[in-house]
């Protein structure tokens, strides 16, 4: 069993437990009653290389990363630093996240929020909207093709943006076929947890021009952002490098300023 398989087994059990408390009809009603979603795709297309800043306590590869007692305070610092989108991990077992974190961040910031989790079915899509998410992560490696296409449609039907994550050219082709408009190329292989920063540069140039391209994993500083920008990234998603920085607001601002500098490569579209 791969690391991804193990995570997905836990997620399915946790979703079933939540659905036993709040059924699908109730979570759909809560999603319908939520304020309209913000346009995350438009935020990512603003001038310069955008930064998606992540609230991340732990990971399967590194274990505990940061003791984030107040995710709202961290998210507010990210927004003050110029982040375009706040990513909030809600997977509990390996990443120590929660839907309560999502709620807290939604109350604290006015920019779009990404629910970062391992989505396995429609319940979680409506759950994300009910808790204030504007964007949802869909991992190609975790989903069959029909489910992927269906979940992209459902995400968009609720006014949210789907960030479709890939790690190989085959997965990128599947994402395009399923109708993805925003594709994240993860340098980390979720089956082995190994990181190869060259992955983005190998996959992104083959994506259609109109696709919004996000580089995920491996950003430790401005040099990494500039390298990803040179390979065609519209934005970078950064978690560990921010929560371990000691000054998250400044760390975000440094990346944002590098992405806005005239010397920074600009995506062609």
From Swiss-Prot:
Entry GO MF terms: indole-3-glycerol-phosphate synthase activity; phosphoribosylanthranilate isomerase activity
This enzyme's EC code(s): 4.1.1.48
InterPro entries documented for this protein: Aldolase_TIM (IPR013785), Indole-3-glycerol_P_synth (IPR045186), Indole-3-glycerol_P_synth_dom (IPR013798), Indole-3-GlycerolPSynthase_CS (IPR001468), RibuloseP-bd_barrel (IPR011060)
PANTHER family per record: INDOLE-3-GLYCEROL-PHOSPHATE SYNTHASE (PTHR22854:SF2), TRYPTOPHAN BIOSYNTHESIS PROTEIN (PTHR22854)
Keywords: Amino-acid biosynthesis, Aromatic amino acid biosynthesis, Decarboxylase, Lyase, Tryptophan biosynthesis
Identification of the protein by name: Indole-3-glycerol phosphate synthase
Domain of life of the source: Bacteria
């Amino acid at each position: 069993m791969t690391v991804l398989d193990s995570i997905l087994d836990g997620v399915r059990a946790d979703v079933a437990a939540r659905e036993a408390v709040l059924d699908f009809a109730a979570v759909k009603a809560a999603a319908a009653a939520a304020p309209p979603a913000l346009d995350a795709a438009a935020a990512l297309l603003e001038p310069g290389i955008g930064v998606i800043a992540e609230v991340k306590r732990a990971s399967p590869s590194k274990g505990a990363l940061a003791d984030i007692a107040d995710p709202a305070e961290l998210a507010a610092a990210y927004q003050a630093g110029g982040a375009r989108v706040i990513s909030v991990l809600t997977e509990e077992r390996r990443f120590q996240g929660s839907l309560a974190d999502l709620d807290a961040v939604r109350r604290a910031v006015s920019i779009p929020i990404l629910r970062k989790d391992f989505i396995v079915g429609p319940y979680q899509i409506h759950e994300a909207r009910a808790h204030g998410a504007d964007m949802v992560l869909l991992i190609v490696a975790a989903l069959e093709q029909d489910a992927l296409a269906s979940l992209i449609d459902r995400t968009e039907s609720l006014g949210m943006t789907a960030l479709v994550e890939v790690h190989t050219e085959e997965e990128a082709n599947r994402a395009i076929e399923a109708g993805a408009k925003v594709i994240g190329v993860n340098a980390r292989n979720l089956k082995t947890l190994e990181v190869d920063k060259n992955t983005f540069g190998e996959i992104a140039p083959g994506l259609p021009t109109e696709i919004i391209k996000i580089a995920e994993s491996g950003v430790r500083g401005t040099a990494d952002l500039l390298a990803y920008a040179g390979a065609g990234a519209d934005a970078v998603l950064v978690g560990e490098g921010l929560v371990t920085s000691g000054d998250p607001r400044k760390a975000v601002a440094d990346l944002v300023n590098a992405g806005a500098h005239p010397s920074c490569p600009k995506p062609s579209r």
